């Protein structure tokens, strides 16, 4: 309880605590997060490496091909209420098992045959990933000490980016050896390995739980402790007000973060090809720096937050984000620098946002609710941002308008995330 509350305990005969849940070591917590994170983005990326093969084999139109990446992102937004209910009913561990099972099955179904199976499997993957998107922050908040949350969140963000990069690099060579169907289906092995880990971990934790002594029965004559907490009601109200204010700011911040990320990912290669005259291979390689540099941001935020404050790290990320569109507008010849800075920002921005939420979420339920609201808003914005940026380009015949859109989105992240980080550290 906060120091200013006055606590009066009228009876010292306290009831014995129920059996505590077995505590998982930090190593195994991180290991569990890593095996899930690898499967939370990679299956979406895999088809993009062989999209021409898929279209030639299935007759999928360009708009249908866009659904292979757009549909999961839309489901990230629409399926968050389902994920929240699953966590409340089954707990985060079982929800993660459902997530990995869905990703594994969806990845296989997607490669089986017709266009309907291709899109149906993709939808299943998106819905299953949403379960993991919400469950992982809940696990981090519950099992990780608060001062290590940014580090573990950074590892989570970094592994998602590494998984995407590995999948992007590996799918095309696999397709050359065995065809695109086997190539994209092969990534189900990663989800299967993660599923095996989590099933074994749950069995172990249940065995440890069963071996713990039963709760001490309380005699009917034993008086229950009477605790009078003066000011507790007002403190709780104040905490909820802070929680709601921070969550509202983070919803806006993640809208800017996600929309800027997906718009940049969709159009940066073409932008560099058309505006700087780069060949397709060079523009793609330069754009890949935007993805790879995310690992620096994911780990850089917790390191900087440890040495200074989280709001300082968030402000640095904000400056890097804003430099991407401004740099491409004012100094386009330095596009490699701006791509790297933007990549650092997109990895660090995710880490910063999901390191702020646990500071105001005082329970697993509040954590799940906040994570769901933030991700629903962010991914809904991300669903429409690439199309809107493309429309701006075709309407104006220039990349200036899409870059101004990305500037507005990154400024939204910068202002809202920085304010949220600052006010949480004041309380």
What is each residue range found by the language model?
Residues 364-398:
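A late C-terminal transmembrane helix in Major Facilitator Superfamily
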Residues 48, 245-288, 295:
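Extracytoplasmic gate region of multi-pass secondary transporters
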Residues 115, 146, 156-206:
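Helix-loop-helix hairpin linking two adjacent transmembrane segments in secondary transporters
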């Amino acid at each position: 309880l906060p120091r200013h509350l006055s606590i009066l305990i009228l009876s010292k005969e306290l009831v014995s605590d129920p059996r505590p849940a077995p505590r998982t070591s930090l190593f195994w917590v991180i290991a569990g997060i890593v095996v899930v994170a690898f499967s939370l983005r990679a299956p979406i990326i895999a088809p993009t490496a062989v999209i021409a093969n898929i279209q030639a084999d299935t007759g999928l139109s360009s708009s249908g091909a866009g659904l292979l990446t757009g549909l999961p992102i839309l489901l990230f937004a629409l399926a968050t209420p389902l994920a929240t209910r699953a966590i409340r009913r089954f707990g985060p561990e079982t929800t993660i098992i459902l997530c990995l099972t869905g990703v594994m099955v969806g990845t296989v179904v997607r490669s089986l045959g017709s266009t309907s199976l291709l899109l149906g499997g993709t939808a299943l993957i998106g819905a299953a990933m949403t379960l993991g998107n919400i469950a992982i922050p809940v696990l981090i908040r519950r099992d990780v000490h608060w001062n290590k949350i940014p580090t573990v969140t950074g590892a989570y963000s970094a592994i998602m980016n590494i998984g995407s990069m590995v999948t992007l690099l590996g799918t095309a060579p696999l397709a050359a050896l065995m065809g695109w169907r086997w190539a994209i289906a092969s990534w189900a092995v990663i989800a299967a390995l993660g599923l095996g880990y989590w099933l074994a971990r749950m069995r172990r934790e249940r065995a440890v739980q069963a071996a713990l002594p039963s709760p001490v029965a309380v005699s009917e004559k034993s008086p229950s402790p009477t605790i009078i907490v003066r000011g507790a009601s007002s403190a709780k109200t104040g905490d909820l007000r802070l929680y709601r204010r921070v969550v509202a700011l983070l919803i806006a911040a993640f809208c800017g973060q996600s929309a800027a990320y997906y718009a940049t990912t969709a159009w940066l290669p073409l932008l560099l090809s058309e505006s700087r005259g780069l060949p397709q291979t060079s523009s793609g390689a330069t754009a890949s720096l935007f993805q790879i540099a995310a690992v620096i941001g994911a780990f850089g935020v917790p390191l900087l937050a440890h040495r200074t404050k989280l709001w300082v790290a968030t402000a640095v990320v904000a400056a890097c984000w804003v430099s991407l569109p401004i740099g491409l507008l004012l100094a386009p010849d330095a596009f490699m620098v701006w791509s790297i800075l933007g990549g650092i920002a997109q990895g660090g921005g995710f880490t910063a946002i999901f390191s702020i939420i646990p500071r105001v979420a005082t329970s697993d339920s509040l954590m799940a609710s906040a994570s769901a609201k933030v991700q629903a808003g962010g991914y809904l914005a991300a669903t429409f941002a690439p199309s809107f940026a493309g429309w701006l380009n075709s309407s104006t015949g220039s990349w200036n308008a899409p870059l101004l859109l990305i500037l507005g989105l990154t400024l939204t992240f910068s202002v809202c995330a920085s304010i949220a980080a600052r006010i949480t550290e004041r309380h």
